Amino acid sequence: MSPQEATALHVLAYVLLHNGQSEKAAVLLEALDALRPGDSRTLLALAAAHLRAGAAARALYALDRLTYDAAAPPTANLLRAQALSLLDRPDEARRAMHAFIAPKPPLSPG
């Protein structure tokens, strides 16, 4: 799959997600994940779609598949906090929210 095709599918999933079709967006993003496994942009969008569809456990599974490193997007922790909260895991949700709001080191010019 070309990068342009992947981008087109992401745009379609975004439109579906923001027009009340979160389940359809999740199906599309699951297919995209099968074609390009481990893509962080896809996994974040998939987690958001699952959260909107009320599937917190599936959202958390998508987030758990992300590779965390220094460049991991902060929104992953926000989505994780939301999923954990919905799963009635308040202590873990609090830690994820603290990680989301924690000060980040400035980017060095490179």
What label would you give each PLM region?
Residues 5-27:
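Alpha-helical segment of the N-proximal tetratricopeptide repeat
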